[in-house]
Amino acid sequence: MPGYSDNIIRNASGLIPMVIEQTSRGERSYDIYSRLLKERIIFLLGEVEDHMANLVVAQLLFLESENPEKDISLYINSPGGVVTAGLAIYDTMQFIKPDVSTLCIGQAASAAALLLCAGAEGKRFCLPNSRVMIHQPLGGYRGQATDIEIHARETLAVRERLNNIMAKHTKKTPDQIMRDTERDNFMSATQAMEYGLIDKVLYDRQVAGHSTDL
């Protein structure tokens, strides 16, 4: 089973909790994230960047190969990050056969908010004190005037693509998404539900419908 990168986990918390599992062959130890991966739970933690995106994509593909009919849960606590890394995860979520249920714990901002709303319809959740933030993509470039113009056009094209994706999953128009993301737009869990970014605010485990008892 592909486990989580030790460096990623140490950088996030400074410590990797370990759990011991009793098997017919004796004891086996896992880091906590690999143990949860056995329950089809993937964590998207911290900044969305290429290495983290590769890790999440690999786990999505692995879980699909294990059981293409069983849902995958993606737990999100992220300030966002690189657009292309976020889109790599997004495309994989849409590509694989299992439904991907998303759950915001803490925050889902920028690219992470896009991934939150991209979960399977009816299976997008927030915990009650989570925060969600949407905005237009950020970009900066220094160089010759012609190159700056090229990068400005690319940023506008990326913005249009992101607006269309979010419009698809929230059932709003791209024009409304453009207006609402003109500046940082922070929402509570309830506001995110009203906006269409999620389907339900979870106040207890029973409502979530996850099969695991963890």
Curated annotation (Swiss-Prot):
GO molecular-function term, one example from the UniProt record: ATPase binding
Keyword Cytoplasm appears in the UniProt entry: yes
Localisation: Cytoplasm
Gene Ontology, cellular component aspect: cytoplasm; endopeptidase Clp complex
Keyword Protease attributed: yes
Top enzyme category: hydrolase
Name of the featured protein: ATP-dependent Clp protease proteolytic subunit
Gene expressing this chain: clpP
